[in-house]
Structure formats: structure tokens, C-alpha cells
Amino acid sequence: MSDPLPAWSDAFELGRLPPVPQLVLDGPINREWAIGGSTGAGIKVAIIDSGIDASHPAVGSVEGAIIIEPDDSEPDGFRVIEGPHTDLYGHGTACAGIIRSVAPDVSIYSVRVLGERLTGKAWVFATGLEWAIENGMNVVNLSLSTSNEAHIPMFHELTDAAAFAHVMLVSAMANEPKTTVPSEFSSVFSTASIRSDDPYEVRYNAAGPAEWAARGVDVDVAWADGSSITATGNSFAAPHVAGVIALLLAKHPGLTTFQVKTILAAMATAPGSVTQ
């Protein structure tokens, strides 16, 4: 009898490996090849934030919505409320409007974890992220984060789960120079803002910790109560990247997290043109 293989070896036996899409190239990886002609149809995008105003003309339809809020009377310390809801601040609506403008045919889902002051509890945020992973979202926009080091293990476990489930997590870096999670984990699309008039422009920084940058300075965004404002911040760059990733996944389904990163990096160095 042969000695047993070391742990994890069985998963790599022929016939057991899950299929990974092979990219067939007929030219350079550029913006036209990656997202040209795509509208994001068939892609589910969750926005974990302050809620979404589905009646805002810049947002369009919201396919699903849940609220996760603390509740000491519940065994787990929180309750989940399914169904339409309002945006308590305007921040989530802004992100939804940006994503809709970049990828008009995506299915948007709202996961409300922040309150009317745009604050919340890390474990409520984590519960919302877990919901997005378990409910088959393709892309998750995270224009929020935590700087509390005590929460690093919890979010590290969730971001790993997302990566292996091929769920793309796009997370805004903090607007101040401080360490935050999950934005700085390597499997996450950590995003900073640049001044640009091109909503499809994505820049790549291999040195990190902010790996990606997109339009996020003086951006006209949807806001609460049907209004709009001009805003600046990494929060508004992340949904631009999330929208571009949705376009990419719709055109090239089944890509892994690191395949998407490779393609985005190639787009950033050879942007080309795009046909929408």
C-alpha cells in the first residue's frame, strides 16, 4: 500500500479539478477586447452600504434588498429584513447610480448595513458580506471599511471565501492615509480615486496598497430624495471599477478573481477604445 498523500493533494487529481475558463486571444488584451459591446446583462452586483433609493431615476430597478441591523432580542444579535427600503444617507444611492451608468443592464442588490450617520458595526457589515457571497453575487461594491485590527481575521476569512467563490470584491480605500480592511487584502480590488472624465478608465498600481484607481473626483452622483450632488472620494471610484468588472464578467463569464485582475492590469496599460 502506498503512503497517503499530503493534505490537499487529492483536490488536484485529474478529473477533480473544477474547470477554469481558458482565454482565447485573437489580439491584445485591451478595453475593446475586454468590455466592448458589454452592458453587464446577467451579472449580479451587490452594494453593501446605506441602502438604495430605487425610485431615483439614475438608479433604475433594484432586484433585491435586505437590511441587516443590530437587535439584541435575536439569538444572533441582529435581524435581517427583506424587501424594499430607503437610503438613510444617500451614499448607497450614489454608488448604485454610478454602477448603473457604467453597466446599465446589471442586476443591482442593496444590502443596508449603515445607519443615517453612515456608521455601523463591523460584524453587521461582515454579515452583509457573507449574505452577498452566499447568495450568488458576482460583484460586491464595498465603499466602506474598518480600521479596527480586531476585525482583520473575520474579514480575511470572508474575503478568502469570496475569492474561491469567484465573487469580485471592490473596496474603496480610506480617504485618509490609514490601514483599513477588507480593502487592503490582496484578493480585493482596492480602489482609490483620480480626476478623470472617462468612466471606464482604470489605472493599475502594482506597488499597492491601493492597487486600482478610477474616476472619483468632482463626480456628479445620485443622492437621497431624488437629488444629486458633486462628490469626491474613493467611495465613488470603487463603483466605477465594480461597473467595469461587471462588463468584463458579462462578456467573459466564469473568470476567477486573479484572471480579472490580470485583464484589468492589461487594460490599464493598453486602454484602447470601447464600443458601448
Segments (PLM) and residue ranges:
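Mature extracellular/periplasmic domains of secretome proteins
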Residues: 33-40, 120-141, 151-167, 177-190, ...
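Subtilisin-like peptidase catalytic core
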Residues: 78-147, 266-268
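Structural detector of well-ordered beta-strand residues that form the stable sheet scaffold
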Residues: 109, 168-170
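C-terminal subdomain of the subtilisin-like protease fold in secreted/lumenal serine endopeptidases
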Residues: 138-142, 252-276
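Gly/Ser-rich catalytic serine loop of serine hydrolases
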Residues: 84-93, 174, 229-241
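Active-site core segment of subtilase-fold serine proteases
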Residues: 2-102, 106
